[in-house]
C-alpha cells in the first residue's frame, strides 16, 4: 500500500456545537484544520425539545427557547475566551438541529462540517430515525467530520 497523503485545508468550516465534550473536540479539530479560513460555530436551539417540555406542562415553549438561547450565548462567551488565540464566528438559531445545520452549511457555502458524536444510545427515536450526526452525514453537500 502506498503512503498517499492528501492535504486538503478547508477555506470555510461549520462546527455544530451542543457544548458537549465531543463538540468541543470538534471545535478544537476545526481550529487545527482550518488555521487561516473562516470558522463558524453554530448552536441550534432544538424547538422540538422545547415543544416536548411545553407538552409536559413544565414551561411554555417560548420560555424554554429563551433560556436555551441565553445559555448558549453564555457558553459561546466562555468558548471565545478559552479559544482567544483563534477568532471564530458564532451563530445561535432555532429549529430542528440537523435541518438547520444542513441549511446553514449550504448558506455559508462551507467546505466541511465538523461535529461531535455522542455514544450510541438505545432511545427509540434514534433507533428509528438516527442521531443528528447520522442525519447530517446523510444529507450534507460537503464532507462531515464526526469527532467522538
Q: Residue ranges of each PLM-predicted region?
A:
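Short, structured coil segments at secondary-structure junctions
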Residues: 34-35, 84, 132, 140-141
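General small-molecule cofactor/ligand-binding pocket signal
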Residues: 40-42, 89-93, 145
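Glycine-rich, Arg-bearing micro-motifs that act as flexible, cationic patches
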Residues: 112-138
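Structural beta-alpha unit
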Residues: 2-8, 80-113
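Short, flexible loop segments at boundaries between secondary-structure elements
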Residues: 137-148
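A short acidic, glycine-rich active-site loop
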Residues: 59-74
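Small/aliphatic-rich secondary-structure junction motif
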Residues: 5-58
Amino acid at each position: 500500500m502506498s503512503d498517499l497523503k492528501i492535504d486538503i485545508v478547508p477555506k470555510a468550516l461549520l462546527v455544530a456545537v451542543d457544548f458537549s465534550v465531543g463538540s468541543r473536540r470538534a471545535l478544537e479539530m476545526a481550529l487545527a484544520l482550518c488555521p487561516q479560513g473562516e470558522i463558524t460555530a453554530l448552536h441550534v436551539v432544538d424547538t422540538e425539545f422545547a415543544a416536548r417540555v411545553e407538552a409536559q406542562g413544565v414551561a411554555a415553549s417560548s420560555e424554554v427557547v429563551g433560556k436555551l438561547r441565553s445559555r448558549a450565548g453564555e457558553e459561546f462567551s466562555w468558548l471565545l475566551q478559552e479559544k482567544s488565540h483563534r477568532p471564530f464566528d458564532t451563530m445561535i438559531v432555532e429549529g430542528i438541529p440537523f435541518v438547520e445545520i444542513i441549511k446553514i452549511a449550504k448558506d455559508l457555502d462551507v467546505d466541511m462540517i465538523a461535529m461531535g458524536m455522542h455514544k450510541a444510545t438505545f432511545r427509540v427515536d434514534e433507533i428509528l430515525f438516527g442521531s443528528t450526526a447520522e442525519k447530517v452525514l446523510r444529507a450534507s453537500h460537503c464532507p462531515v467530520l464526526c469527532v467522538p
